[in-house]
Every structure is written in C-alpha cells, then in structure tokens.
Amino acid sequence: MKLTCMMIVAVLFLTAWTFVTADDSRNGLENLSPKARHEMKNPEASKSNKRYECYSTGTFCGINGGLCCSNLCLFFVCLTFS
C-alpha cells in the first residue's frame, strides 16, 4: 500500500516536472529552420545573447533560483536575506 502511494506520487511529480521544464511546443518542429536562419542573419536575435532581468523579492521563480536577483529561490518564491 505504501509502495503504491509512493509510486503514484513519484509519477505525478515526474509528470508535473515534465510540464514545468518543457519548452513551448506551439511553434513545433516545422518552424525551427526559419528561426535559425533569422538568428544567423542577426546574431543579436539569438536567445543566448539576450539579457534577462532578474525577479525581485516575493515573485514566483519556479525551480530556477538563477532568475532571482538574490539567486535564492525557496518554495517557488524569490527570497532575500539581509
């Protein structure tokens, strides 16, 4: 019984993890080539060259603490210790 409950929780967690970390699939594979050509013509349009702003304290950060200005994400919220 306990093993069954643990397996159900693990499957639900992994399913949620897949949805949270998945890329936006609306573009699909058919649009990858035009985007790549555009990025080759204009290297500044590349995602790797974009600078993202950090999230302030109290904002939702998901599972990536690097998005917070303080680099501290606990329970999906950016925190700051002072």
UniProtKB/Swiss-Prot annotation:
Keyword Transcription regulation: no
Keyword vocabulary terms for this entry: Cleavage on pair of basic residues, Disulfide bond, Ion channel impairing toxin, Knottin, Neurotoxin, Presynaptic neurotoxin, Secreted, Signal, Toxin, Voltage-gated sodium channel impairing toxin
GO cellular component: extracellular region; host cell presynaptic membrane
Tissue: Expressed by the venom duct.
InterPro entries: Conotoxin, Conotoxin_d-typ_CS, Conotoxin_omega-typ_CS
S-S pairs: 54-69, 61-73, 68-78
Entry annotated with the keyword Signal: yes
MF (Gene Ontology): sodium channel inhibitor activity; toxin activity
Compartment annotation: Secreted
Main location: secreted
Signal peptide location: 1-22
Transmembrane segments: none
Residues that make up the propeptide removed upon maturation: 23-49
Family membership: Belongs to the conotoxin O1 superfamily.
Extra remark beyond the main annotation: Found in the dissected venom (DV), but not in the injectable (milked) venom (IV).
Free-text domain note: The presence of a 'disulfide through disulfide knot' structurally defines this protein as a knottin. The cysteine framework is VI/VII (C-C-CC-C-C).
Protein's job: Delta-conotoxins bind to site 6 of voltage-gated sodium channels (Nav) and inhibit the inactivation process.
The protein's name in its UniProt record: Delta-conotoxin-like CnVIA
Source species: Conus consors
